[in-house]
Amino acid sequence: MRTHYSSDVNEKLQNQKVTICGWVHRRRDHGGVIFLDIRDRTGLVQLVFNPESKAFKVADSLRGEYVIKATGTVNLRPEGQENKNLASGKVEIIGEDLEIVNKSKTIPFQLDDFQSTGEDVKLKYRYIDLRRPEMQNKLITRSKAIRYVRNFLDNNGFLDIETPFLTKATPEGARDYLVPSRNFNGKFYALPQSPQLFKQLLMVSGFDRYYQVVKCFRDEDLRADRQPEFTQIDIEASFIDEAFIMSTMEKMIAGLFDATIGVKFDTPFQVMTYAEAMDKYGSDKPDLRIPLEFVNIKEDMKNEEFKVFSGPANDPEARVVAMRVPGGNDKLSRKKIDEYTKFVGIYGARGLAYIKINSLSEGKEGLQSPIVKNISEETLFKVIEKTGAQVGDVLFFGAAKAKIVNDSMGALRAKIGEDFEIFTKDWAPLWVVDFPMFEKDDNRLYAVHHPFTAPKVDTVEELTKDPENLLSRAYDMVINGYEVGGGSIRIHRQDMQAKVFNLLGISDEEAREKFGFMLDALSYGTPIHGGIAFGVDRLIMLLTNTTNIRDVIAFPKTQTASCLMTEAPSNVSLEQLNELGIAVKKEDK
C-alpha cells in the first residue's frame, strides 16, 4: 500500500510521487488549504490539499485518528516554514489521491494531553496510549535491545533453546501461578518463575552454552518495578567460572548500551563485595553515581551517655553510622530535614539525628543540632574528622539494628542524591560479589539467592561447619542502583545439593518429591556450570530513562495484577470448572 514511511520522506525525494499510510494526527484549515500531519511509527509528515485537488472534499471530511492512505508529490516547504523537530520537516507532500481506510470515534483522551489522563484510562485503552510516539519509541528500543542481545549471544556460541511453560510447582520464593490439569484431576502445573532447573539440565545434557529470551511468572505483591509476568534474558554455560560469566556479560551489556543509546561503559566493571556494599551504602545494589558514603562510628559512641547512640553502639546486632552531605547547609532546610525524618520512618527508623557544621573553630558552638549537647566535644570532633566534614556540610546519623540502619540510611542516601542531583557521573555499572550463602530468619536458614547457588567451599563437611557465615559464588550486575542481572556458579554435585536442601529445612522426602529429577541428573556426570539472568524490563527502563515498568511493556498489568483492557482475570463457566474438577469457594462477606 505504501511506498515510504513518514520519516523517509525528505528533500532527496523532491518532485517524486510517494504513497504514505497512517493516522491523522492533526488537521488544520488555513485559508481554504487543508494541512494534515500524518503519523506512523516513524514520525510525522505534512500532507497538503489545495481546493483544486480532486481529493480536497475527502480531506475536508477527515478527523483525528482517521486511518488514511494518500499519494502525492514531495515539495520543499516554503522558506521559514520548515520544522526542525521532524525528520520530514524540510518537505511536505502535495496531496493528489486520498483514501479513508477507516474512520475513528473520538478517542477517550488526546495523545498530546496524556499527562492529565489517569493511568487507569490509559491502561483500559492501551492500544490508543501506544500510539504516542514516546511509547512507541520505548518499545522500538526494546526490540532493538533484544535483537542486539540475541546477535551477541549467537556470535559467542550460545544456543537459543526453549524450555517448558507448563512445569512442576517448586518452592523458589514467590508463589507460583498454577494451571489445573484436565487429564489429571486435582493436579496442577505451575508457570515457571524462571527456567532455572531446565537450563541446568541442559548443561547436564551437554549443550554447553544456552540462552533464551523468556517470560517468567511470579504471583507476588507488586511494586513500581515489578510485574506478575516479566521477561528475562536467561543464560547458562558449562566448564566456566565467575570470571568468564562476568567478563562476557559486561561486554554484552556495554555493547548493548552503546548500540541502543550511544552510552559507552568502561570495562571491566568495578567489582565490590556484598560486605563492602552494605558497609558503605547500606544496599547490595548501590547507586555509585551518588558520592555519599556511610562512616562507621560505633566504637566512638560506645562510652557516650547519649543512649540513642550508645545503646546501638553496644549491641552486636546494631550499627551506628554517619553520612556526610557536602554543602548540605545550603540545601537542607529544617522543613526538608523534617521531611527526611518522616521518610526514614518508613524503614523503621525512630528518628533522624543530624548536625550542621557552621564552624570548626568554635567547639560545640559551631555545631547546630539538638543532639550536640548530649555528646562530648571530643567524640563530636572525632566523628567530624572521620567523615571529613567541612564548614557548610551536614552529617546525618543512623543508630539501630543493622537492617533498619541499612534500609533507612541507604534509602535516604538515594533520595538525597535524587532530590539534589548530586551525581558525579551519568552511569555507574558494577558487580556485587561474595554474597552470603544463607540468611537466618525465625531461627531458620533461607537461601539468599536460590538453593542451587554454589557455596565457596568444596566439601559437605565445610558446608555444614558454619553455614550462617558461608559465602556463595553469586554475582549481581548493578547499574545506577538497579539490579539488572543476577546469577551464580551452580552446585554440580548431588551430595552438596542434597545437603543444601537439608540446611534449608527441606527433608530428604520433600527434596525427592520436589526436586528428585534434579538430584538424579546431578548423579549422571554434571559439568561445572553457571549463568545469569537479566531483567529485560528493568534494562529497558534504564535505556529509555523511565521509572515505571509499565511504560516499557506493551500490555502490562496493574499493581493488582489485573488487565483493565481485557478485564483479566475473569470468571469462567461452570462447565469449564466441572471439567477441571474445581469448585470455587465463595469469599465470606
Swiss-Prot record:
One BP term from GO: aspartyl-tRNA aminoacylation
Known catalytic reactions: tRNA(Asx) + L-aspartate + ATP = L-aspartyl-tRNA(Asx) + AMP + diphosphate
Site for Important for tRNA non-discrimination, residues: 30, 80
EC number of this enzyme: 6.1.1.23
Subcellular locations according to the entry: Cytoplasm
Chain intervals for the UniProt region annotation (Aspartate): 196-199
Binding residues for L-aspartate: 172, 218, 449, 490
GO molecular function ontology, one term from the record: aspartate-tRNA ligase activity
Residues engaged in binding ATP: 218-220, 227, 483, 535-538
Swiss-Prot/TrEMBL keywords: Aminoacyl-tRNA synthetase, ATP-binding, Cytoplasm, Ligase, Nucleotide-binding, Protein biosynthesis
Entry keyword annotation includes Nucleotide-binding: yes
Family listed: Belongs to the class-II aminoacyl-tRNA synthetase family. Type 1 subfamily.
Role: Aspartyl-tRNA synthetase with relaxed tRNA specificity since it is able to aspartylate not only its cognate tRNA(Asp) but also tRNA(Asn). Reaction proceeds in two steps: L-aspartate is first activated by ATP to form Asp-AMP and then transferred to the acceptor end of tRNA(Asp/Asn).
Assembly behavior: Homodimer.
Protein's recorded name: Aspartate--tRNA(Asp/Asn) ligase
Originating organism: Francisella philomiragia subsp. philomiragia (strain ATCC 25017 / CCUG 19701 / FSC 153 / O#319-036)
Taxonomic placement: Bacteria, Pseudomonadati, Pseudomonadota, Gammaproteobacteria, Thiotrichales
